[in-house]
């Protein structure tokens, strides 16, 4: 299973890494709704060394060199998803010209860190909606697994009702096209992409398996992106939030900014 309670892992690393121990295969495809499986703790063999334990949540994605870069068009996809306890289809390009998109990947359903992120985004969904932004979650699990997880109470490790779709990437093609797939494990790293209304990736961040993402920072980055797109002659300095002073990206403008802070 995907990691949650372990020593901190680094962000995507160029060094080779050991596979994540104890992750079972994704929920099997079935026409009948599966019962939510009980979460099993990650176990390492007694012979594992201290260094092996420390690196057990460090994984490396394949195809990173081919991953979509900030400033390029996001790879399109058309996939099945679960929303409002129904099966729907989601096509990324349908949002072009209409909405910003927060697209985030997570390793597996019925795990540990993942539900904390997924429910946190759902709890803040109305704030993103006011910024004309849709949220899309993606994992390699089937829609049946997604549905079972949504139908499981939060107090039991489930998600409860969500305000945005969970996309099924059983072919792993979406994860691969965004450069977050870990080939030898068949799951995705915690990648997050902010895509503007033109379908262009404006921000990306990829955490390793043990590190959850911040909804607050995602919101702040989205607000900064929208500000500079509305004010193309200005830039946002470090930690900028709505109401803070921005900067003109020229010698005179920068001097005015630094003199004012």
From Swiss-Prot:
Summarize the impact of residue 114 to S. Answer: Loss of activity
CDD domains assigned? PRX_Typ2cys (cd03015)
Per UniProt, the transit peptide runs over 1-60
PROSITE patterns from the xrefs?
THIOREDOXIN_2
Domain named Thioredoxin: residues: 68-227
What Pfam families does the entry give?
1-cysPrx_C, AhpC-TSA
* A Gene Ontology term for the protein's cellular component: chloroplast
* Swiss-Prot/TrEMBL catalytic activity: a hydroperoxide + [thioredoxin]-dithiol = an alcohol + [thioredoxin]-disulfide + H2O
Q: Where is the active site?
A: 114 (cysteine sulfenic acid (-soh) intermediate)
The EC number(s) this enzyme carries: 1.11.1.24
Q: Which UniProt keyword terms apply here?
A: Antioxidant, Chloroplast, Disulfide bond, Hydrogen peroxide, Oxidoreductase, Peroxidase, Plastid, Redox-active center, Transit peptide
Biological process (GO) annotations?
Answer: cell redox homeostasis; hydrogen peroxide catabolic process; response to oxidative stress
InterPro entries, A to Z: AhpC/TSA, Peroxiredoxin, Peroxiredoxin_C, Thioredoxin-like_sf, Thioredoxin_domain
Where found, per UniProt?
Answer: Plastid, Chloroplast
- Domain of life, per the record? Eukaryota
Similarity field: Belongs to the peroxiredoxin family. AhpC/Prx1 subfamily.
Q: How does it assemble?
A: Homodimer; disulfide-linked, upon oxidation. Interacts with the plastidial NADPH-dependent thioredoxin reductase NTRC.
What's the miscellaneous note? The active site is a conserved redox-active cysteine residue, the peroxidatic cysteine (C(P)), which makes the nucleophilic attack on the peroxide substrate. The peroxide oxidizes the C(P)-SH to cysteine sulfenic acid (C(P)-SOH), which then reacts with another cysteine residue, the resolving cysteine (C(R)), to form a disulfide bridge. The disulfide is subsequently reduced by an appropriate electron donor to complete the catalytic cycle. In this typical 2-Cys peroxiredoxin, C(R) is provided by the other dimeric subunit to form an intersubunit disulfide.
Q: What does this protein do?
A: Thiol-specific peroxidase that catalyzes the reduction of hydrogen peroxide and organic hydroperoxides to water and alcohols, respectively. Plays a role in cell protection against oxidative stress by detoxifying peroxides. May be an antioxidant enzyme particularly in the developing shoot and photosynthesizing leaf.
Kindly provide the name given to this protein in its UniProt entry. 2-Cys peroxiredoxin BAS1, chloroplastic
